Amino acid sequence: MLTWLELSVNYEVIIMAITQAMCTSFKVELLNGVHAFGTTVARGSTTADTMKIALFTSSATLDATTTAYSTSNETSGTGYSAGGNTLTTVAPTSSGTTAFTDFADTTWSTSTITARGALIYNSTQSDKSVAVLDFGSDKSSSAGDFTIVFPTADASNAIIRIA
């Protein structure tokens, strides 16, 4: 007599994900006047806040609910420092009914790093999050340049658009 043995195994799968989004907390903070991308008087200051971009591995969980920069699952490697690069902001402007701002491209020169996504955050305002970038897959550099090319700064393409 032939008997089949059924084996039941339970697996707990933890899936990390990076989902591109403008952070919800950032939207509320905009309405509260927390972030200053330009040099117009804000909070009694005429200097723009410092925006930074940090790279993260595929183990990171970043999405619209991300409220602040954290070193958890941040990329590491030659040519990369924790906290990432300081961004150069393109002056906020508008076209039609859409306000927008963007950033100049940024490069980690002669670097050896792998990243799945990035977080743009405001280091002037307690590292509050602005936006999450999802690269779609791991991107790497090996003793070369790792460059993030931002889209055209216009009402249809800028990385931060409010319509």
Task: Locate each region found by the language model.
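Short, Lys/Arg-enriched N-terminal segments with co-localized hydrophobic residues
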Residues: 1-15
